[in-house]
Amino acid sequence: MSKKPVRVAVTGAAGQIGYALLFRIASGEMLGKDQPVILQLLEIPDEKAQKALKGVMMELDDCAFPLLAGMEAHGDPMTAFKDADYALLVGSRPRGPGMERAELLAVNGAIFTAQGKALNAVASRNVKVLVVGNPANTNAYIAMKSAPDLPRKNFTAMLRLDHNRAASQIAAKTGKAVADIEKLVVWGNHSPTMYADYRFATIKGESVAKMINDQEWNANTFLPTVGKRGAAIIEARGLSSAASAANAAIDHMRDWALGTNGKWVTMGIPSDGQYGIPKDTMFGFPVTCENGEYKLVEGLEIDAFSQERINKTLEELQGEQAGVAHLI
């Protein structure tokens, strides 16, 4: 029995990340090789962006994906999010030269307030929302607060890029396969303050912390490398990390939808107060996923160094939340 198509809304669909993302969704990499999809693609309602979106759709057509059951172009979230089962909010306003962070928060605040309200009005009541557009945690917080009729747990922010970056650095340091790394955690904000924590991580049952056994490397090389990786890629490539961000979005949604088989992954989720993180703060936590639901990994010990790092990233997030409080 073939499955009924699900509706996947993607914003910023003609952008760099959108271009790296859509073909992989349509090929079945995100929701499985037996799940047809209808793509509901949103771009800003100006002629140039809509024309570019049409070009992307022409290419999607030309791939003749068996799982692509339909697609639509939209300039309004109220139509783009209609009955959406999944929503990937990729589009956001990047920080321009000389733009203050407060200004960036305000501009994106308006975008994500409107998108949260639209999801609240027209999306499926079980819609799974992933915010990719930066500042991702705060944009997800705004969207969640703007959608009071949808469950809080349906809103998530993307920390998977930080998680994957951290795994890659650990694999390089230990000379082991990245696929064998388990129980890695990234706490906090998707920003250079995030705290990638390998204290619980294992490779084929062996402790990563014992293998590396170098706190100076952890504090002075590993954490800054992971935290500033996005800036390093812009410096090298002249463009932001679009393909790796799209890959992380696929990983995040696939694991949420199809499960992690008991493995830990990192998701930005609204806190319920665990680990001392105030309720509703959109924070990177370790989770496992099963039957379309994520579950927080609880009871992990937080040592003094980790607490200091968690406090630092929390402080930044609370500052961002305060900066958008007037919008909510």
Curated annotation (Swiss-Prot):
EC category: oxidoreductase
CDD domains for the chain: MDH_chloroplast-like
InterPro entries (alphabetical): L-lactate/malate_DH, Lactate/malate_DH_C, Lactate/malate_DH_N, Lactate_DH/Glyco_Ohase_4_C, Malate_DH_type2, NAD(P)-bd_dom_sf
Keyword Oxidoreductase: yes
UniProt binding sites for substrate: R95, R101, N134, R165
PANTHER family assigned: MALATE DEHYDROGENASE (PTHR23382)
Family annotation (HAMAP family): Malate_dehydrog_2
Protein name per the record: Malate dehydrogenase
The organism of origin for this protein: Variovorax paradoxus (strain S110)
